[in-house]
């Protein structure tokens, strides 16, 4: 059931009915203000959103412009690359054409070289004889392989060590390659052929090359199949020489004039060549190893006729020697033949033991090893130096080690000069009687302090060297450290007595004083100091520091 409605007061109801239709209720102000505020907030939010959108549009527009610029740059680079590719293609075509031309020229040059090698192998050529100069000077004769080659006998080759043999082979190959690079038309020597085949490049006991059968009594030239000294050249004196001998010509005239020998019937197509007899100091390897006597002369005998008619070749084919004006002609000589000047061999490295001269120092070093081995074989139980003398000269902690034998040439009289090389070879014995040996690099020194200074090189990173306390830089000598420290301290102990200027080194002061000496020479200072010892030396000198 519905609840009963509360009872109303009749007076209250009546009062309410009277007021409601005549007076309406007013709207509150708070609700109006809140509505206006919310509307304003909504408007500002819309404005902010519009501004953010405008910023995004501007950013997108900027990026679009940047992309357009980069696209244009890429297009330009692409166009440049296309141009470069076209130019490179054109250059490549030109280089290919040049390369083809070079290949053709190389083929022609190779064929020419093959033809020259065939001529050299067949020995179907004449040796070039250069005429003398306008002033009578000797012509420049091309270098041959025998001029720079050294040959060893079988005994000497057996005494060499393996590394010395390899060094010898390397030097011989280098000499041949050098001559070929200088455009000398020479064939490959037999010694290089044996080296390539793995054979020993030495001579047998008779002075002949191994693997070649020639007459024992007549040694032949290296690299040729002909005997170097024909019978008509090694024969006794010719009639021209006999006449000079009977006339008792001066010795100088006999030495200056060459020997002339007539062409015998055995010469064939050869030519008698006038040469000068070499002295004992100018002995060549052919004489030393092949056992040629001093009375024989060396020459080259061409074989085969010349292609050019007439001229000097016509006389040479007849075997007629050339003689000087005023000399008696040999029998059967008519006309003149070209003159061949002998080439003097300059060998500036003589051996002090046997007198043999060498053109290269390495050949002398290898040759001296043979003397050392011979000395050891002759006296195997005897050392080169006396043990008692060497032990008596040793200091505590030092030992004598075996090293290379240092040989000194004997004293020569004043004014005498060696023939080989044109230089004086006056030997001087060392001041020190023993050598100091470095165990690291096998070097020898005459003074102990030199060995101590040298051993600092093997310590590494400047260990054991005096170092600067300011910058830590290490020096080999204490005197160098003292001079270096003056850079940090600013000390200038050397003062000029003329102008008062100071220097940190003695020789700087000496150079400075020479400037004053050019203008005037005062009584208080020398014009030019003769030596550093004339000036005050507050610091120890190089000799005192050791």
Curated annotation (Swiss-Prot):
ZnF endpoints (C2H2-type): 349-371, 436-458, 466-488, 494-516
Keyword Transcription listed: yes
Subcellular location: Nucleus
Sites bearing N-acetylalanine, chain numbering: 2
UniProt keyword annotations, A-Z: Acetylation, Coiled coil, DNA-binding, Metal-binding, Nucleus, Repeat, Transcription, Transcription regulation, Zinc, Zinc-finger
Region: Disordered, residue numbers: 1-30, 218-270, 291-344, 372-391, 527-546
Biased composition annotated in UniProt, kind: Low complexity: 302-312
Top-level taxon of the source organism: Eukaryota
SUPFAM superfamilies hit by this protein: beta-beta-alpha zinc fingers (SSF57667), KRAB domain (Kruppel-associated box) (SSF109640)
Pfam families: KRAB, zf-C2H2
UniProt keyword Cytoplasm, yes or no: no
Extent of Basic and acidic residues compositional bias: 1-18, 242-258
Protein name as catalogued: Zinc finger protein 783
Organism encoding this protein: Homo sapiens
């Amino acid at each position: 059931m519905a609840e009963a409605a509360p009872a109303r007061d009749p007076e209250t109801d009546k009062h309410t009915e009277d007021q409601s239709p005549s007076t309406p209720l007013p709207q509150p102000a708070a609700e109006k203000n809140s509505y206006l505020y919310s509307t304003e907030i909504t408007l500002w939010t819309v404005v902010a959103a519009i501004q953010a959108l405008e910023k995004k549009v501007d950013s997108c527009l900027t990026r679009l412009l940047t992309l357009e610029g980069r696209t244009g740059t890429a297009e330009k680079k692409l166009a440049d690359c296309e141009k470069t590719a076209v130019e490179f293609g054109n250059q490549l075509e030109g280089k290919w054409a040049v390369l083809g031309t070079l290949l053709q020229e190389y083929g022609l040059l190779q064929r020419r070289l093959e033809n020259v090698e065939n001529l050299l192998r067949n020995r179907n050529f004449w040796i070039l004889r250069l005429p003398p100069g306008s002033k009578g000077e000797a012509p420049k004769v091309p270098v041959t392989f025998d001029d720079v080659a050294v040959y060893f006998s079988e005994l000497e080759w057996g005494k060499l060590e393996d590394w010395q043999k390899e060094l010898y082979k390397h030097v011989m190959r280098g000499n041949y390659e050098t001559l070929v690079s200088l455009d000398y038309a020479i064939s490959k020597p037999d010694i290089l052929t044996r080296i390539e085949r793995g054979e020993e490049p030495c001579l047998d006991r008779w002075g002949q090359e191994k693997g070649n059968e020639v007459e024992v009594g007549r040694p032949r030239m290296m690299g040729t199949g002909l005997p170097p000294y024909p019978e008509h050249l090694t024969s006794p004196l010719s009639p021209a020489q006999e006449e000079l001998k009977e006339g008792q010509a001066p010795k100088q005239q006999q030495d200056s004039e060459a020997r002339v020998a007539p062409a015998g019937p055995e010469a064939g197509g050869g030519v008698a060549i006038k040469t000068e007899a070499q002295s004992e100091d100018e002995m060549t390897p052919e004489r030393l190893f092949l056992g040629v006597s001093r009375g024989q002369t060396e020459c080259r005998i061409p074989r085969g006729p010349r292609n050019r008619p007439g001229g000097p070749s016509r006389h040479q084919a007849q075997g007629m020697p050339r003689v000087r004006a005023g000399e008696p002609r040999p029998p059967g000589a008519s006309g003149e033949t070209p003159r061949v000047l002998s080439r003097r061999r300059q060998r500036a490295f003589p051996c002090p033991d046997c007198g043999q001269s060498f053109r290269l120092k390495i050949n002398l070093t290898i040759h001296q090893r043979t003397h050392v081995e011979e000395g050891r074989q002759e006296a195997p139980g005897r050392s080169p130096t006396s043990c008692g003398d060497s032990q008596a000269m040793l200091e505590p902690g030092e030992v004598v080690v075996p090293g290379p034998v240092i040989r000194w040439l004997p004293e020569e009289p004043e004014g005498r000069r060696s023939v080989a090389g044109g230089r004086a070879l006056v030997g001087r014995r060392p001041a020190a009687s023993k050598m100091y040996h470095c165990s690291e690099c096998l070097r020898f020194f005459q003074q102990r302090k030199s060995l101590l200074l040298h051993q600092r090189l093997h310590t590494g990173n400047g260990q054991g060297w005096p170092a600067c306390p300011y910058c830590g830089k290490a020096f080999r000598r204490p005197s160098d450290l003292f001079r270096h420290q003056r850079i940090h301290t600013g000390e200038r102990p050397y003062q000029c007595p003329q102008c008062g200027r100071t220097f940190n080194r003695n020789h700087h002061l000496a150079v400075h004083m020479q400037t004053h000496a050019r203008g005037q020479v005062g009584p208080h200072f020398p014009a030019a100091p003769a030596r550093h010892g004339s000036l005050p030396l507050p610091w120890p000198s190089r000799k005192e520091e050791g």
